[in-house]
């Protein structure tokens, strides 16, 4: 890239970074509305992570969320557990004001909490004046976080060449159609790290990214792609909505190669690049910290992406075998330095 500014975001081979920065445990939630729309946040330019990108709500775990192993190479540090689930719900609350909690362990519906009470609690939790769990107990003594309804949906580890790295557990949460009038599921901006939260269909988010109107990083793009294939299918009745959710849940829990999507650990790695300016990212490796483990990524799909100064552009998902064959036949494929 002689004479040009280097892209802010790239993905290269593991071999180029023998000692990557430790990956911070974090969690993120793909929140599905009663109408099967997806909530994304637009991070401001000065945000500490993924500036100007549209992202799922989420962030770093805190000690109050629960214990995770301190050694970055310890497999247990990366495995899904109650700390990740608690962190996902806490971060969702801090960033959007949405509260996924029930009045008790036996309650079926979400705890309704007014906008004013949530706003005050959100500010206190974010500033560290009170822990998230303590605040919840103060407004409803028997309340519990709705961690059981979080569905694990891949775990991502930032590539080794990126200075700020995360080991991120992704979840899906379906807001029950019966909760439409519950104030606890109404999102508002936090005025700190994000702009206004917005609900759109997964199809619409992908379309905006393809047209260049928004930035989606490869993990968000891939997960929206997989969600859109099912949730954006025909039918808008409540019966259709619930049917499509059941299909998506089954896909996450039982489909995928070599392991189901709920069990995939993915650290994108540059596989090849072409004269079209796009890299092909393989998704089958779990990351340098986990290379000695039995954890696996995905060997069916690849991500095609062009890394520009402002972030990833021209992102697309393809079947690995088909993409590599087509690029070789067209003569636009070159091996990476892996």
Q: Which functions belong to the PLM regions below?
A:
Residues 1-338:
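N-terminal leader/linker segments that precede catalytic domains of diphosphate-processing enzymes
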């Amino acid at each position: 890239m002689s004479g040009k500014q280097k892209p802010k975001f790239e993905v290269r081979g593991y071999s180029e970074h023998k000692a990557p920065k430790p990956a911070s445990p974090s969690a993120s939630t793909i929140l599905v509305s009663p109408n099967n729309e997806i909530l994304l946040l637009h991070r401001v330019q000065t945000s500490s992570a993924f500036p100007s990108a549209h992202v799922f709500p989420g962030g770093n775990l805190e000690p109050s969320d629960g214990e995770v192993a301190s050694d970055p190479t310890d497999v247990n540090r990366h495995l899904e557990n109650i700390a990740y689930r608690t962190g996902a719900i806490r971060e969702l609350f801090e960033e959007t004001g949405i509260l996924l909690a029930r009045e008790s362990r036996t309650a079926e519906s979400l705890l309704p909490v007014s906008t004013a009470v949530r706003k005050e609690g959100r500010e206190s939790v974010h500033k560290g004046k009170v822990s998230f769990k303590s605040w919840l107990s103060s407004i409803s003594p028997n309340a519990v976080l709705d961690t059981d309804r979080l569905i694990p949906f891949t775990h991502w580890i930032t590539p080794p060449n990126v200075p700020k790295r995360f080991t991120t557990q992704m979840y899906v949460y379906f807001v029950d159609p019966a909760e439409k009038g519950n104030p606890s599921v109404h999102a508002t901006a936090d005025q700190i790290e994000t702009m206004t939260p917005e609900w759109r269909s997964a199809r619409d988010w992908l379309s905006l990214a393809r047209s260049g109107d928004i930035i989606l990083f490869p993990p968000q793009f891939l997960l929206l792609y997989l969600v859109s294939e099912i949730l954006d299918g025909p039918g808008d009745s409540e019966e259709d909505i619930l049917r499509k959710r059941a299909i998506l849940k089954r896909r996450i829990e039982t489909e995928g190669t070599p392991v189901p999507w709920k069990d995939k650990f993915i650290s994108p790695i540059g596989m090849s690049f072409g004269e079209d300016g796009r890299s092909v990212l393989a998704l089958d490796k779990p990351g340098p910290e986990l290379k000695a483990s039995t954890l696996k990524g995905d060997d069916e799909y690849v991500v095609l992406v062009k890394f520009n100064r402002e972030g990833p552009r021209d992102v697309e998902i393809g079947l690995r075998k088909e993409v590599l064959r087509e690029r070789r036949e067209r003569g636009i494929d070159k091996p990476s330095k892996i």
